[in-house]
Amino acid sequence: MIKSFFIVKKKPSLTQDEFLRYWKEEHGPLAAKLIPGLRKYVQCHPVKAAGLEFKIDGIGEIWWDNFDSLQNYFTWRQSEEAKMLIEDEKRFIDMSETVRFFAEEHVIVNH
């Protein structure tokens, strides 16, 4: 199993609530519909609690069956079909602050 992690920050013009609503209700379904080979897609939204502040606005996680599926995603990302999703990301994510990480999962505990 291969996982992609995307650490995202919102555009400064958006409130936290606007950003999270758009990401979950608009962008999430679009990504699920357009990204080929997607096994699982999760959005991690920050917990609102007194005293908690974060330097990021969320983490996206995408699961891939194998390295070939991930490679196909990279190829797709350069295609005409991906432009709609990429343009949508630019609407609400500060792309200059996005950090991407790709990893092979090794489960240590799974209760």
Indicate residue ranges for each PLM-predicted region.
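Macromolecular interaction modules
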Residues: 1-111
